[in-house]
């Protein structure tokens, strides 16, 4: 029996129309464009500012584009998984809402929560469903409305984040392509450094939690930066060595778009020139689970069938990892 691999056969993406610039941010908090660009690398970020719209809205836009580009029949979709830290509701899952919006009658669906590392976990999870031989078409989506949890009076965090979504189609192949390997890690000791204080079962919503701004993202930036650099660098180097990849045979690295200095540090550790590293943080900011697929959406036309790509990310938990992918097709599929 031939080995079944899980290959990426298409990508779709969406970012909201409204753009929040550094100039506008500087009117909210004590900062400026030069500081934000130098320290974070963000020039602008897209914000979903229409009332009553959440992550499922952006996920639907991305997935609809994906299905059009790949020519997928809604009845043929077996599974939908959404990685998000900003679900529409605590329940039901954003994935189930997305299935309804896409008219998928034969798919089952669930959410996956691994913060900014969510899409890495999605790729490995979906790949294993494909490898089982029981599933033929899987849509995976990273979607986050980070503006819903950002405190726009906190100069340390509000310049960093944006909203967006992107999706991959994953299908079986017997070619030597697709998700080839992964190294995924978790360390729950990271809780104090990156979390939302209230809103869960430990500290349910109350007048007190709202009045004390406990429903916003809390991040201890210096600690997170240090862990992100070391973790992403180490795991990227490890997966390259494990698979016999060198700086010459790696075609692309797709890092989580959290901070341009983290991205540059990972490239330096891997001895890779920055022209092999996909970077779009300047225009989107950190869209959490959406950063990795949004990078592919932006740079799809650069990719060639058989390209060796290392995806790497770091997020709350702490969660981190790397996924090695051999790309499945040439160039950009038109929508």
Curated annotation (Swiss-Prot):
Q: Which reaction does it catalyse?
A: malonyl-[ACP] + acetyl-CoA + H(+) = 3-oxobutanoyl-[ACP] + CO2 + CoA
A Pfam family it matches: ACP_syn_III_C
Q: Which GO terms describe its molecular function?
A: 3-oxoacyl-[acyl-carrier-protein] synthase activity; beta-ketoacyl-acyl-carrier-protein synthase III activity
Q: Which UniProt keywords apply?
A: Acyltransferase, Cytoplasm, Fatty acid biosynthesis, Fatty acid metabolism, Lipid biosynthesis, Lipid metabolism, Multifunctional enzyme, Transferase
Chief location of this protein within or outside the cell: cytoplasm
List the SUPFAM superfamilies hit by this protein, alphabetically.
Thiolase-like
The record describes the protein's role as: Catalyzes the condensation reaction of fatty acid synthesis by the addition to an acyl acceptor of two carbons from malonyl-ACP. Catalyzes the first condensation reaction which initiates fatty acid synthesis and may therefore play a role in governing the total rate of fatty acid production. Possesses both acetoacetyl-ACP synthase and acetyl transacylase activities. Its substrate specificity determines the biosynthesis of branched-chain and/or straight-chain of fatty acids.
Spell out the HAMAP family in the cross-references. FabH
This one is known as Beta-ketoacyl-[acyl-carrier-protein] synthase III 2
Native organism: Bacteroides thetaiotaomicron (strain ATCC 29148 / DSM 2079 / JCM 5827 / CCUG 10774 / NCTC 10582 / VPI-5482 / E50)
